[in-house]
Amino acid sequence: MNAPDKLQDLLSLTREPFPASRKVYAEGSEGVRVPMREIALTNGERVTVYDTSGPYTDPLATIDAKLGLPSVRTGWIEARGDTETYAGRNRVALDDGGKHEETARIEALRAQAAALQRTPRRAKAGGNVTQMHYARRGIVTPEMEYVAIRENGKREWMREYLGDAEREARLAGNAKGARIPEIYTPEFVRDEVARGRAIIPANINHPEVEPMAIGRNFGVKINANIGNSAVTSSIEEEVEKLVWAIRWGADNVMDLSTGRNIHTTRDWIVRNSPVPIGTVPIYQALEKVGGIAEDLTWAIYRDTLIEQAEQGVDYFTIHAGVRLPFIHLTANRRTGIVSRGGSILAKWCITHHKENFLYTHFEEICEIMKAYDVSFSLGDGLRPGSASDANDAAQFAELKTLGELTQVAWKHDVQTMIEGPGHVPMHLIQANMDEQIKHCHEAPFYTLGPLTIDIAPGYDHIASAIGAAMIGWMGTAMLCYVTPKEHLGLPDRDDVKQGIIAYKIAAHAADIAKGHPGARARDDAMSKARFEFRWHDQFNLGLDPDTARDYHDETLPKDSSKEAHFCSMCGPKFCSMKITQDVRDYAAAKGLSEEQALADVEQGMAAKSAEFKAQGGELYIPITPVQA
């Protein structure tokens, strides 16, 4: 399907359910209804998996992108009685930056976006409406119950695969210090949020969001970045990228738009997103001053924070750790400061020779965050942009500052996670995790990869997924995906899918290594289907059924090939699984155990060996000519 390029194309976003799948729901209390995806196997089994796609893969759901998604949380928010609606700030043309367009198409999108926007809501005077604030007061919110049900999933189908005590003991994970429960309870979720070890990013102005948790003691999550640039992409294309990203497994999405119509793009994305949305507010603030970093002011930035909080952004990347005293530490780096936000603020600090205004106004930022329940994603503006800059003084000086700011945020009960690198060779990854836990008090870590090598342009999603799997196992709570276009250009729809699949692999590998309950059951179901040559089930249990089916059908396209007990790799005579099945069939026919059958085979082979030796051990036996 081509990316949409007209307003009406927003009515036909990607809606197809996955093959052999349907949306199912686990019910809780107070209207808690958690969606999951059920995969029907050809042997009658039902496998249920975590689902990030929202209502888009539910054929029974009615979706009109011009109206936005239905609310999940409005009733919960209103029932708490600690918020109020208000008129909100007046939208101005500058909100869409200095490069906004005035074409008829954009004006139509902008007008429709104005209708999309809900009446903003905020905490009542002097109030605090964060999930951390509730958690620290012993309140279990519906959002926390939702998370517990979602993390558990439906486990009945797993019993067949997890019942072998010897196997489970042999394959037990190493949690690397994490404390992962066998069963998630709402009380466990509350305690993790209260301690700051987990966050539930859920702005009160984003009632459409399906609550999820980011934390070391939960399943490893992934984030996908979308957003336009000054040179490419449209609003319609970015909304389709959002839907496409969550289809393939993005738990969160960041809108990193830096080009035209930033405000309008964000309206469309937030209102149509069932997953938390993050932004980097400094990008829009920079657009408001015409792209001149030194013209940024606290007043402009503060106004931008409120604007985005009213729209419903769930977490802000804020580069408050890029401090004036640290900038000189980057002077001898091979690649300097590679973070866009970090470089903007470094330039501002050097130009004015003043401390970063995000650092000096941090407590004021906390006041805004707690009025809307926007979570901090404390940005790593001094992250290494190459392997040779990894783990240097600048990176770790900033990390220590982020730990200090975390405690300030927690003083205000503001949920906080910490962003991390970047480019880190494999042997230095553990040190990154150790330093983060040490200085940031177990706040969730959120890393970009890291990329383990620098020589893979076009394949950086692979180079980084290696590092992502490692650091996910070590304790990182969320992995920010990298696409094949990293360092090369703005990713398109296919790049987004490739990046997400690479990172779903990394996150799942980390969950298995950590011993996350039930993580391996889907793999066992796949292995069983593979051994039994149930080709359709193999496709449908995979992370990407479409590609798996296409690859198989390139060489064996006929329907009859889906029943064959071989593939094109080995053919019918050399398939190891077919040979093993033949041994088992022989054993069953003879009334033997599999071990006895193998012993029979070995005995027969020994007899043939003895016969060969008795004949002289010659490979070629002379043949006496027949006399005429």
From Swiss-Prot:
Cofactor(s) named in the record: [4Fe-4S] cluster
Binding site for Zn(2+): H423, H487
Catalytic activity: 5-amino-1-(5-phospho-beta-D-ribosyl)imidazole + S-adenosyl-L-methionine = 4-amino-2-methyl-5-(phosphooxymethyl)pyrimidine + CO + 5'-deoxyadenosine + formate + L-methionine + 3 H(+)
Annotated InterPro entries: ThiC (IPR037509), ThiC-associated_dom (IPR025747), ThiC/Bza_core_dom (IPR038521), ThiC/BzaA/B (IPR002817)
Cofactor note: Binds 1 [4Fe-4S] cluster per subunit. The cluster is coordinated with 3 cysteines and an exchangeable S-adenosyl-L-methionine.
One Gene Ontology term from the biological process aspect of the record: thiamine diphosphate biosynthetic process
Pathway per the UniProt entry: Cofactor biosynthesis; thiamine diphosphate biosynthesis
One MF annotation (Gene Ontology) recorded for this entry: zinc ion binding
EC nos: 4.1.99.17
CC terms in the record's Gene Ontology section: cytosol
Task of the protein: Catalyzes the synthesis of the hydroxymethylpyrimidine phosphate (HMP-P) moiety of thiamine from aminoimidazole ribotide (AIR) in a radical S-adenosyl-L-methionine (SAM)-dependent reaction.
Protein's name in the database: Phosphomethylpyrimidine synthase
Source organism per UniProt: Leptothrix cholodnii (strain ATCC 51168 / LMG 8142 / SP-6)
